[in-house]
């Protein structure tokens, strides 16, 4: 019995690691500022949180669609090129969580560093330095007043 449990534990351990270490390549469809699809794979960009598509930000009391702009900036960065995503988790919506690259550029890092997403501290400590750079230089959404994307989602639950 102990041998069976040990063997099953080893199988589970190795099978879960192989899923988490998956590499996905291809031309993505951009869903929003932190989500892409490659073929049938839904991918959430690790460690970042971008404004939701319908989310607005304010500059001098003027609203602008920062969520749509975040998506546009991601599309511009990828510009119909192939990306490489290295998964490290699967989220509660059954999406792969991954760090993705276009050429040698870390897409996740670029989105935060240029102010089109924030570091998602709830799940990761990655990209905090990049967020500070964007905030200090008033890049992207940091040039405006905005609600953190996770707070926006909470407030606008359907």
For each predicted feature, which ranges?
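Small beta-barrel nucleic-acid-binding modules, primarily SNase/OB-fold domains
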Residues: 4-11, 15-158
């Amino acid at each position: 019995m102990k041998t069976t449990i040990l063997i099953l534990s080893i199988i589970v351990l190795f099978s879960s690691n192989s899923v988490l270490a998956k590499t996905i390549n291809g031309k993505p469809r951009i869903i929003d500022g932190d989500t892409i699809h490659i073929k049938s794979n839904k991918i959430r960009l690790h460690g970042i949180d971008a404004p939701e598509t319908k989310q607005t930000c304010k500059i001098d009391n003027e609203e602008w669609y920062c969520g749509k702009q975040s998506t546009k900036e991601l599309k511009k960065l990828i510009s119909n090129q192939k990306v490489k995503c290295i998964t490290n988790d699967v989220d509660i919506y059954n999406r792969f969580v991954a760090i993705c690259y276009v050429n040698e550029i870390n897409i996740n890092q670029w989105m935060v560093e240029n102010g089109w997403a924030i570091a998602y501290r709830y799940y990761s400590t990655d990209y905090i330095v990049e967020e500070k750079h964007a905030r200090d230089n008033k890049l992207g959404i940091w040039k405006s007043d905005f609600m953190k994307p996770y707070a926006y989602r909470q407030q606008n639950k359907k």
